[in-house]
From Swiss-Prot:
Annotated S-S bridges: none
Modification type N6-acetyllysine: residues: 524
Reactions catalysed, as given in the entry: acetate + ATP + CoA = acetyl-CoA + AMP + diphosphate; propanoate + ATP + CoA = propanoyl-CoA + AMP + diphosphate; butanoate + ATP + CoA = butanoyl-CoA + AMP + diphosphate
Stated name of the protein: Acyl-CoA synthetase short-chain family member 3, mitochondrial
Keywords associated with the record: Acetylation, ATP-binding, Ligase, Lipid metabolism, Mitochondrion, Nucleotide-binding, Transit peptide
Binding-site list for CoA: 227-230, 624
Annotated positions of the N6-succinyllysine modification: 518
Pfam families: ACAS_N, AMP-binding, AMP-binding_C
Record bears the keyword Cytoplasm: no
Highest taxon above the source species: Eukaryota
Function of the protein: Catalyzes the synthesis of acetyl-CoA from short-chain fatty acids. Propionate is the preferred substrate but can also utilize acetate and butyrate with a much lower affinity.
UniProt: ATP binding residues: 425-427, 446-451, 539, 554, 565
One CC-aspect GO term: mitochondrial matrix
Amino acid sequence: MKPSWLQCHKVTSAGGLGGPLPGSSPARGASAALRALVVPGPRGGLGGRGCRALSSGSGSEYKTHFAASVTDPERFWGKAAEQISWYKPWTKTLENKHSPSTSWFVEGMLNVCYNAVDRHIENGKGDKIAIIYDSPVTNTKATFTYKEVLEQVSKLAGVLVKHGIKKGDTVVIYMPMIPQAMYTMLACARIGAIHSLIFGGFASKELSSRIDHVKPKVVVTASFGIEPGRRVEYVPLVEEALKIGQHKPDKILIYNRPNMEAVPLAPGRDLDWDEEMAKAQSHDCVPVLSEHPLYILYTSGTTGLPKGVIRPTGGYAVMLNWSMSSIYGLQPGEVWWAASDLGWVVGHSYICYGPLLHGNTTVLYEGKPVGTPDAGAYFRVLAEHGVAALFTAPTAIRAIRQQDPGAALGKQYSLTRFKTLFVAGERCDVETLEWSKNVFRVPVLDHWWQTETGSPITASCVGLGNSKTPPPGQAGKSVPGYNVMILDDNMQKLKARCLGNIVVKLPLPPGAFSGLWKNQEAFKHLYFEKFPGYYDTMDAGYMDEEGYVYVMSRVDDVINVAGHRISAGAIEESILSHGTVADCAVVGKEDPLKGHVPLALCVLRKDINATEEQVLEEIVKHVRQNIGPVAAFRNAVFVKQLPKTRSGKIPRSALSAIVNGKPYKITSTIEDPSIFGHVEEMLKQA
């Protein structure tokens, strides 16, 4: 039940789950801002299946939406916000009082947990499946309805409140890929607590720095994380982090995983999850202001203070709900799978909050693309659960291809409900893209975004009629709200197909970060000082004549070869397109004549019989044909594996340091740190 005083004040969308029937008059947040922008589709909202079904793929609807989002963002996002339920209407849709940060839906009050769970139950969807938990590492499969999720989340919210957590307090979540991690996120959102979810298994030193920075009253953890072939003991890692650091939380809530030994509790500090839940009282949703932080998510950063991205509640809810239909083309009720980790922004946005806000079924997968048990794992999950759309990283596809080049394991599964494969997290080379299309037999769409934005910056907006067969190598067009431009270092706009700095003209749309936790100076300096009036993505790329954006590399990964700026990503793309190399990373090696020359670290495909010398000769010739002699590419070192972060990114700065014989730091997000030693050894032998 909601507090009674709120019931008559709740503003609900037209056409969304929980809204009045199409044709009824929706309540208004700020009347002028909420007038209908375009003729609504069959569900009365922006985008969605109705728009997609009528689309010819010409993108005319996309063009209308993008233009409206740029010329009149207040009206555009005001309309989208009607699909979210509000306790109190906003007085102003957009405000730039604290530039460069933009405030959205000023003075509006809402609750994300209510929008993600309660409202679906109130509108007769309580028995629909909210979460499918698929854990090959524990041989467990389970489903949870929206009603069952609400029961767990509301009780857990009661546990947190009982132990002193109130609106505005911080909670650190340090858990594996289990439903209880999502329950904790939602329980925090329910009571207005700010969660900071940190990868389960994260090293104690890094965990300690984040605990010291966010100063949680409570840490929520689990007894073990399960990796292929091993268990990770979480509680000793937490204990070590607390010894290293200064801050001590009041309580540690521990979930003991079933069928494993229980961990001992520290008297007076530790709480047993099951015992607390057994005696818990359910807790209602607490309204929060639109700008209230929903979570703090730490991202890779520079030296100094950790870089904790602050996510504002209202704009995030609006953007995620809108994106599920307009970008990803899903109807409520369809099954969605973001094959990521909850610790990444993809996990926050598109395992937990996005699909639940939109009334979808979300797959929570505790496994890997290969090795749990084999390269057919993704195909099994897609077939077994009737997944409509999958979101994964190109590195996962490359891993599957390397293990099973012909996808023999995948071909045994029928993917009748599977419609679209979205990839992001790193550049998707054309070779991987084409292989994916041939194997999965669905459109494969690359798109691009960042932890800071919380949702895509560029994409093929399926729900708005964008082409499902865009040119190879692109990452989509500017998502409505993101006015993307390519500038040189002097802030001059570049012509089509000229490599430059990718920036976004302000204001940033709803859902983008509102700051860095306890570090607003860095927020302004890092993102907004170099190009005043723009958000600096710190990525390099270009835009073609049709508006497709090609993200080539981080600005730092542009290699200066004798005065020519060469994208490392372009060379990688060329190498991978040859077909003999399964994975590669290109870095700049210092050269006394040219300044830098590109060096490739390559992983050969398993089915290649040629010698390394033959392959090197071939790929050098191939790069020369594709990019030209200006790239000065002549050298490659062959390794058995490349180091990757858990989200599939290659740590190029560390590899560049190794190649140039300089000290380097192994960050705690690296999946297997031992690979660095292997790379060093191969470089010595080369």
